[in-house]
Amino acid sequence: MRSAAAALHRLPARALIFLIELYRTYVSPTRMPVCRFTPTCSEYAVTALRTRGLVVGLGLTAVRLAKCAPWHPGGWDPVPQRRPRRRDAAAADAAMSAPHACKGSPHAVVGDTNDGST
C-alpha cells in the first residue's frame, strides 16, 4: 500500500520528466546548442526533479532558467546537494563533539585518564 502511495506521489514529477525527455529527443536536436551551462538546463531539470521531487525540483529549475540571460556567465552549475536535515545535522554534530577516549590515540580527550593503566 505504501509503495502505491509513493508511486502516485512521484507521478507528477515523472510526467514532467517525460515532457522534458520529449523536448530533448525531438525539439532540441533541431536547434543549435545555445545553453551556456553544464549540465544543460534540460539535464539540470531532470536531475533536480529526480533527486529533489516536484516542488523543490521545479523551484531549482526556475532559478536556473532565470540565470539564462546575457548578464550571467554560465559555466558549471550542478543541482545543489541536499542539506542534512536538522535532526540529522544535530546528531552528527553531537557525535563529533562527544568526548571519547581511544586508548593511546591522538583523539583522546584532554584530561582523559583512560591510558590503559589501572
Swiss-Prot record:
<dbReference type="InterPro" id="IPR002696">
    <property type="entry name" value="Membr_insert_effic_factor_YidD"/>
</dbReference>
<feature type="region of interest" description="Disordered">
    <location>
        <begin position="76"/>
        <end position="118"/>
    </location>
</feature>
<dbReference type="Pfam" id="PF01809">
    <property type="entry name" value="YidD"/>
</dbReference>
<keyword id="KW-1003">Cell membrane</keyword>
<dbReference type="GO" id="GO:0005886">
    <property type="term" value="C:plasma membrane"/>
</dbReference>
<protein>
    <recommendedName>
        <fullName>Putative membrane protein insertion efficiency factor</fullName>
    </recommendedName>
</protein>
<feature type="compositionally biased region" description="Low complexity">
    <location>
        <begin position="91"/>
        <end position="101"/>
    </location>
</feature>
<comment type="similarity">
    <text>Belongs to the UPF0161 family.</text>
</comment>
<comment type="function">
    <text>Could be involved in insertion of integral membrane proteins into the membrane.</text>
</comment>
<keyword id="KW-0472">Membrane</keyword>
